[in-house]
Amino acid sequence: MNQGILLAAGFSRRFGSNKLLQPITDGAPLAVVAARRLRAVLPEILAVVNPHDAVLARLLEQNDIPITVCPHAQKGMGASLAWAVSRTPQASAWIIALADMPLIQPATIARIAGALCDPTAIAVPVFQGRRGHPVGFGRAYFEELAQLNGDHGAQSLLRHHAERVQRLVCNDPGIVMDIDTPADLDSTPLN
């Protein structure tokens, strides 16, 4: 079973307030929209949140999004990803999405998931030559994912296993559009 991981444990330092709570589509918060898009394709998803964000945790749970609280989220994206992966050891693959990227099309998520039949597969979407999210990892990478740390997520795995990375060209600008500042939010097509 493919496991969706929604990384929602950041601290929104560049935004100035909790960007993941900002309303976008029909008033739904950014993180909820991103989670819904992931869930549209993957029945099993898990959102990882930081221990200081009870409001986001509650909001996700109210929208039937399972959460896990990463006690050391301040160590960075890698630590949060490792925490979530270690909580889902039964998965056959992990599709890792970012909660500040609500524009990814479900068809792109499905394509990434479909490329992970081989346990050694790694899949990344590419739009106009730019690699984006979500990123998918087959079962063979469980140990490496579960030991990540720092603020660069799974970048080291993508470099170390470059020969295994499938670059899936897609017509989805959402894979490279994240919301880091209020200006990014204002220019989001969903607003």
Short names for language-model regions:
Residues 55-58, 144, 178, 187:
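Phosphate- and divalent-cation-binding pockets in alpha/beta enzyme and binding domains
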Residues 101, 133-134, 146, 167, ...:
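A residue-level structural signature of the nucleotidyltransferase/glycosyltransferase Rossmann-like core
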Residues 23-24, 136-137, 178-180:
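Short beta-strand-to-turn element immediately C-terminal to the catalytic PLP-Schiff-base lysine
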Residues 1-131, 139, 163-170:
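Nucleotide and nucleotide-moiety/phosphate-recognizing core
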Residues 130-131, 135-161:
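Short, glycine-/small-residue-rich phosphate/pyrophosphate-handling segment
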Residues 149-191:
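Conserved alpha/beta core of the MobA/IspD/sugar-nucleotide pyrophosphorylase nucleotidyltransferase superfamily
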Residues 15, 105, 145-146, 189:
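Activation segment
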